[in-house]
A protein has these predicted regions:
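Post-transcriptional modification and biogenesis factors for structured RNAs
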Residues: 1-164
């Protein structure tokens, strides 16, 4: 067996990506402080044909060299929009019948492995700040809370790992 070269991977170019049918998922970043994490989210969103990313609050926006370092050009392919207030984004998404899901540890959260998607339903996954998590007001406004099960000594995963 041999490793494939990049030229053999049959990937989409930026125009093909923009024109392609997307996965019915939107990512909402609620006050993410690390530019490297933001870039990693863009790269993951590109890999999974995610429809759009909302960058909210203090979350930095492209172009920025530290975002570009981990995004590797995905800021050109993945649609994104900045919004000052995450709650405003949630309200807009709900009006479009998109189910809002905060990824957080909270009362009555559903474990990720127990969550079942429904056909023809679109989802917005909300990821929070590296220290404080998803803000309480956003958790309260979300339709569902999903918790990623963890069994070690740490209380959380890095956001770029959680998004993946």
């Amino acid at each position: 067996m041999r490793k494939l070269k990049n030229s053999e991977l049959d990937r989409l170019d930026v125009k093909q990506f923009k024109d392609a049918d997307k996965t019915p998922v939107i990512i909402v970043l609620d006050n993410i402080r690390s530019l490297n994490n933001i870039g990693s989210v863009f790269r993951t969103a590109d890999a999974f044909l995610i429809e759009k990313i909302y960058l909210c609050g203090i979350t930095a926006q492209p172009p920025h060299k530290d975002i570009h370092k981990t995004a590797l050009g995905a800021t050109d392919s993945v649609a994104w929009e900045y919004a000052e207030n995450t709650l405003d984004v949630l309200q807009r998404l709900k009006k479009e019948n998109i189910k809002t899901i905060a990824i957080e540890q909270a009362e009555n959260a559903v474990f990720l492995n127990d969550f079942k998607t429904k056909p023809n339903e679109k989802y917005a996954l909300i990821f929070g700040n590296e220290v404080k998590g998803v803000s309480q007001e956003v958790v309260s406004a979300s339709d569902v809370i999903i918790e990623i099960p963890q069994y070690g000594t740490k209380h959380s995963l890095n956001i770029s790992v959680s998004v993946g």
